[in-house]
Amino acid sequence: MRLCITGGGTGGHLMIAEALVEACANDGHEAIFIGSTSGQDRKYFEQNSKFSHVYFLQTTGVVNQRGLGKLKALWLVLRAFFASRAILKKHNIQATYSVGGFSAAAASFASLSRLIPLFIHEQNAVYGKLNSILKPFATRFISAYDEASPIKGYPVKDIFFKNARLRDEIKCVIFLGGSQGAKAINDLALSVALELEARGVKIIHQAGERDYERVKSAYEELGVKAELCGFTKEMPSLMARADLAVSRSGASTLWELCANALPSFFIPFPHAASDHQYHNAKFIVDNELGWCQREEEDLRATLLSILPQNLADKSKALMEYSSRDVAKKMITDVVMSLNA
């Protein structure tokens, strides 16, 4: 099979694309990538050897633009649309998988115009604008939050499943402020640090590179020994050591925590598009798999109320809920659809 994978802009979308191309390579399928010169697409895939070819077309997001900016963005998408048509023809592409984001627009519409089956993965509980437009025309629409989705789950690296373990008593809490930092989560960690130390609970804290020095100084003033980092590539092993996570609820991190069977207290980023982080976390709460609270609420009181709880039921439920090999299932589904 010859597959085009398109989409990106941000890391969450691109991690799904990465999972899909790895599944393609493992099953002996050829994949090309069509992305954008904007965003993080080049950083992720310019040197990726699993794609036979990669293309970065000049596009930008359309939704948040106004006036002349929107017209220019639409013109760039139109130009990239014709370039994508030529690329799809050149490689004799049989199917296209969109992982969403503004980078996906040109190749997705080009695929439909060439009658190439379009498969879509939606990473968030609230559909992105582009995916909402394309969904009626898609051969398959995959979402971990949709009961009607033919494939359940979210593409997560296998290491998070391998490191999964059943949690019960809380002996270690990991605070995930993200690579850029999340002041609300960092401040929450500092506000409970003395209480956690008094209870004998260890602290692992990814504070983000921007806020690292402030948080480091604050722990020193408190006299609390926390395992602190700004950014780390060792997230799977850090998660594995924790019994509770305090985190934002971007889709990739949320489902990695679920795969690890790590019960989590989610504090959504309040300015996410369409408030999707809140709705991602609400899905987990509605399934009784975790906790969620807005930044402006009493985060400290909620976290302290969680600490005495036995987490075995939630951790076990997470193990049973999370699906393994989702990327492989998505690629197998494309092959079966083409052969039907």
From Swiss-Prot:
One example of a Gene Ontology biological process annotation: peptidoglycan biosynthetic process
Pathway, per record: Cell wall biogenesis; peptidoglycan biosynthesis
Entry's localization field: Cell inner membrane
Residues binding UDP-N-acetyl-alpha-D-glucosamine: 10-12, 124, 179, 277
Enzyme class (EC, first level): transferase
GO molecular function list: UDP-N-acetyl-D-glucosamine:N-acetylmuramoyl-L-alanyl-D-glutamyl-meso-2,6-diaminopimelyl-D-alanyl-D-alanine-diphosphoundecaprenol 4-beta-N-acetylglucosaminlytransferase activity; undecaprenyldiphospho-muramoylpentapeptide beta-N-acetylglucosaminyltransferase activity
Membrane topology classification: Peripheral membrane protein
CDD domains noted in UniProt: GT28_MurG
Protein EC: 2.4.1.227
Keyword NAD among UniProt keywords: no
Keywords assigned by UniProt, alphabetized: Cell cycle, Cell division, Cell inner membrane, Cell membrane, Cell shape, Cell wall biogenesis/degradation, Glycosyltransferase, Membrane, Peptidoglycan synthesis, Transferase
InterPro entries: GlcNAc_MurG, Glyco_trans_28_C, GlycoTrans_28_N
GO cellular component, one term: plasma membrane
Main subcellular location of this protein, as a coarse class: membrane
Catalytic activity: di-trans,octa-cis-undecaprenyl diphospho-N-acetyl-alpha-D-muramoyl-L-alanyl-D-glutamyl-meso-2,6-diaminopimeloyl-D-alanyl-D-alanine + UDP-N-acetyl-alpha-D-glucosamine = di-trans,octa-cis-undecaprenyl diphospho-[N-acetyl-alpha-D-glucosaminyl-(1->4)]-N-acetyl-alpha-D-muramoyl-L-alanyl-D-glutamyl-meso-2,6-diaminopimeloyl-D-alanyl-D-alanine + UDP + H(+)
Protein family (similarity comment): Belongs to the glycosyltransferase 28 family. MurG subfamily.
Free-text function comment from the UniProt entry: Cell wall formation. Catalyzes the transfer of a GlcNAc subunit on undecaprenyl-pyrophosphoryl-MurNAc-pentapeptide (lipid intermediate I) to form undecaprenyl-pyrophosphoryl-MurNAc-(pentapeptide)GlcNAc (lipid intermediate II).
Name listed for the protein in its UniProt record: UDP-N-acetylglucosamine--N-acetylmuramyl-(pentapeptide) pyrophosphoryl-undecaprenol N-acetylglucosamine transferase
Species: Sulfurimonas denitrificans (strain ATCC 33889 / DSM 1251)
Taxonomic lineage: Bacteria, Pseudomonadati, Campylobacterota, Epsilonproteobacteria, Campylobacterales
